[in-house]
Swiss-Prot record:
Disulphide bonds in the chain: none
Localisation: Cell membrane
Protein name: UPF0056 membrane protein BUsg_434
NCBIfam families to which the protein is assigned, alphabetical: NAAT family transporter, PRK10739.1
Length: 196
């Protein structure tokens, strides 16, 4: 039971729903509330599928493709860095490079914001550590996923509270934080790569 609680808390912290909330708000701010909910649910379902795949066969996929976990970390850092630059210096098309009529699909919401390299690597490590307790791992993942989706579905409420200017300010602030996180993720991948 303690393992389930600690694993669930670990997964929630890595998914970081509160940290991702301003990014989700920024990317989805031009969509109406109903469409925003649909997109959040769709992206979270995609993220859950990816997480379950990595939990069960992640290491095998990387082995088949001859990729190391460091590669996942480095590439995730690069993607997040590019997203952060667009958040700090938004173009007329919007911060995610789509027009106001378009909406994100798969990248960047499902991957790498929710199902990011850190989470996918953690799931692979947990699947080795608790090889004979897979039902508990799946349960922990589902609880953490449910907690995250509830917080992200409340993004509309936060949009009403902060308004457009508040969201723009949060966007730039989160962009700065995201640049630091992505750089750290990239450097961790490089460091691990050199160690191996």
């Amino acid at each position: 039971m303690n393992e389930i609680i600690s694993t669930t808390i670990l997964l929630i912290l890595i998914m970081d729903p509160l940290g991702n909330l301003p990014i989700f708000m920024t990317i989805l701010k031009k969509l109406d509330a109903k469409r925003r909910r649909i997109v959040v649910i769709r992206e979270m379902i995609i993220a859950l599928i990816v997480m379950l795949i990595f939990l069960f066969v992640g290491e095998k996929i990387l082995t088949i493709l001859n990729l190391k976990t460091e590669t996942v970390s480095i590439s995730g850092g690069i993607i997040l860095f590019l997203i952060a630059i667009k958040m700090i210096f938004p173009s007329d098309e919007g911060n995610n490079g789509t027009s106001s009529e378009e909406e994100p699909f798969l990248v960047p919401l499902a991957i790498p914001l929710v199902a990011g390299p850190s989470l996918l690597a953690t799931l692979m490590l947990l699947s080795h550590q608790y090889l004979h307790h897979m039902p508990y791992l799946v349960g922990s993942l589902l609880i953490a996923w449910f907690f995250t989706i509830i917080i992200l579905l409340l993004s509309g409420l936060f949009l009403k509270l902060f308004g457009d200017k508040g969201v723009n300010a949060l966007e730039r602030l989160m962009g700065l934080i995201l640049i630091m996180l992505s750089t750290q993720m990239f450097l961790d991948g490089i460091k691990a790569w050199f160690k191996n």
